[in-house]
């Protein structure tokens, strides 16, 4: 189950042009977004560790997104 709130995901789908959004659709997208965010976060943590830091910086996130 996704930890991301469903309401903001619903708003994103509506912002993309949907007039109505089923709860199941919003939940499914929230789960996918969370999986992708965790993947990026893990890469960013690895990059910070490789740089000898405990703190994840914006540059780590940017690099993780690109890779």
From Swiss-Prot:
This is Archaeal histone B. The gene is hpyA2. It is found in: Cytoplasm; Chromosome. Pfam families: CBFD_NFYB_HMF. NCBIfam families: archaea_histone. PANTHER family: ARCHAEAL HISTONE A. Its main location: cytoplasm. Keywords: Chromosome, Cytoplasm, DNA-binding. Homodimer or heterodimer with another histone. Dimers then assemble into higher oligomers, with the DNA wrapped around the protein core. Coiled coil: none annotated. Binds and compact DNA (95 to 150 base pairs) to form nucleosome-like structures that contain positive DNA supercoils. Increases the resistance of DNA to thermal denaturation (in vitro). Residues 20-22, 54-57 are annotated as: Interaction with DNA. One of its GO terms (cellular component) is cytoplasm. Belongs to the archaeal histone HMF family. It comes from Pyrococcus sp. (strain GB-3a). GO terms for molecular function: DNA binding; protein heterodimerization activity.
């Amino acid at each position: 189950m996704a930890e991301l709130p469903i309401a903001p995901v619903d708003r994103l789908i509506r912002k993309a042009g949907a007039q109505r959004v089923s709860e199941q659709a919003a939940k499914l997208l929230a789960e996918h977004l969370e999986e992708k965010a965790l993947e990026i976060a893990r890469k960013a943590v690895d990059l910070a560790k490789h740089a000898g830091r405990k703190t994840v910086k914006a540059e780590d996130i940017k690099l993780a997104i690109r890779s």
